[in-house]
């Protein structure tokens, strides 16, 4: 864990200027098998220190790849000089940020080192199980990834934070051939918050999950193409989370609002069905710890929930301290940086649609001709809210019952229009948190939601 070398250098901050001093250690561990062959075996650690100084509307930033007292002094000095230089040239003349009351947050997470052999042996046991029980698969891929970001932060406002965020996942991809000889595959991630040894102890614990994934692949190999057009569908939790993050979340990040996103003219207006609410959660959601909790952001702002849509009305944005001043809002802890050499950007944390009151069985029974879209493997949206997502697992709904699996397809639409068609929401939320958001810097995020019944454009053959 990082040793605090920062606190002793607070007296070197330039008087009267907002200063953020951050040390960081980021680590990744990875192993991958493809059809029984070890294809990847990696370990990486990066660490360093950075400082950012705000003066009259401009920032000075400096970072160093070695974390020691000399480099701490150097980045404080260089960031201050850069801020002074920028201010002398740009002269924005903006006021100082309101002070954040003193706060201290010490980490309660632990990062436990595990040998690469442990990762390899675990995946090898899973691979042996798959090939022994399911020899008819066309291919199989297993990957393990563990990563963590540990940060020490002190600011001129008196914020003092030490935070560690380890997470670990195993990814399984199973592929089979259709009767026509065309490969189809399904992907599933297992794991979550915590080091590898906290989430995975016995490979046999995943055998049941792999069995269920295999059964789904076998259904998909007999699948049919969806009928193209606007259909009544049930979006599974993964797709609801993708909508929340990609199609809505990015449009309500305040820096993108300033860039002209669709959320700008829609603040305070109806953008979804009255039964839809959506929040970017800081560290707790629906009575439980969020998948990737954030307690203090990299500007030193204490993290609190950011309500975005309430009862169908767009009620807020996600902000940095600077954009919060611009919009007359309160910062809620959304400014985060990926590496020690990165400046904080407005980022999502754990973004989800709130659960409703409906049972998934009743939702399926309510549809005479439609689809249940379970999983997605990719998606993109622009700042107008227009989106297109891939669907890798889905099923027909015929006369209120689940039917045949469907082959890979896509769904598309405009978020604020599609969300107005939501008329049923299930009472259970599921999360995904195994990937990264790619907005300029990669960033671990959580996203999720309940199943939602809506109308959406679906692709066909």
List PLM regions with ranges.
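N-terminal small-residue-enriched
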Residues: 1-461
């Amino acid at each position: 864990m990082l040793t605090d070398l920062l606190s002793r250098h607070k007296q070197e901050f330039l008087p009267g200027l907002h200063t953020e001093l951050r040390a960081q250690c980021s680590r990744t561990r990875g192993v991958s098998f493809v059809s029984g062959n070890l294809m990847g075996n990696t370990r990486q650690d990066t660490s360093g220190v950075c400082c950012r100084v705000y003066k009259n509307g401009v920032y000075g930033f400096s970072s160093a790849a070695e974390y020691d007292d000399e480099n701490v002094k150097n980045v404080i000095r260089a960031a201050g000089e850069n801020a002074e230089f920028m201010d002398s040239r740009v002269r924005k003349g903006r006021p100082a940020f309101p002070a954040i009351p003193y706060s201290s947050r010490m980490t309660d997470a632990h990062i436990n080192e595990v040998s690469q052999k442990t990762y390899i042996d675990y995946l090898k046991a899973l691979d042996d199980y798959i090939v022994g029980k399911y020899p008819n698969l066309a291919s199989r891929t297993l990957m393990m990834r563990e990563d963590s970001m540990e940060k020490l932060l002190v600011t001129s406002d008196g914020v003092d934070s030490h935070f560690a965020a380890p997470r670990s996942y195993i990814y399984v991809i199973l592929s089979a051939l259709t009767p026509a000889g065309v490969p189809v595959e399904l992907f599933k991630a297992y794991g979550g918050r915590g080091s590898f040894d906290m989430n995975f102890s016995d490979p046999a614990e995943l055998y049941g999950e792999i069995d269920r994934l295999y059964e789904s692949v076998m259904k998909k190999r007999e699948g049919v193409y969806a009928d193209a057009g606007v259909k009544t569908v049930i979006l599974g939790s993964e797709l609801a989370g993708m909508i929340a993050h990609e199609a809505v979340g990015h449009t309500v990040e305040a820096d993108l609002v300033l860039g002209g996103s669709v959320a700008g003219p829609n603040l305070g207006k109806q953008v979804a069905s009255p039964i839809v609410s959506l929040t970017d959660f800081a560290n707790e959601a629906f009575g439980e710890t969020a998948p990737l909790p954030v307690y203090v952001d990299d500007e030193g702002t204490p993290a609190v929930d950011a309500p975005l849509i309430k009862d169908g009305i767009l009620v807020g944005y996600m902000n940095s301290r600077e954009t919060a001043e611009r919009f007359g809002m309160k910062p809620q802890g959304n400014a985060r940086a990926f590496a020690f050499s990165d400046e904080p950007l407005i980022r999502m944390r754990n973004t989800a649609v709130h659960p409703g009151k409906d049972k998934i069985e009743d939702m399926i029974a309510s549809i005479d001709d439609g689809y249940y879209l379970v999983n997605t493997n990719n998606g993109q949206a622009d700042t107008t809210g227009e989106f297109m997502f891939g669907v890798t697992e889905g099923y027909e709904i015929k006369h209120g019952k689940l039917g045949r699996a469907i082959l890979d397809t896509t769904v598309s639409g405009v978020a604020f229009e599609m969300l107005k068609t939501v008329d049923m929401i299930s009472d259970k939320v599921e999360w995904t948190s195994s990937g990264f958001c790619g907005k300029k810097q990669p960033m671990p995020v959580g996203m999720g939601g309940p199943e939602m019944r809506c109308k959406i454009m679906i692709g066909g053959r």
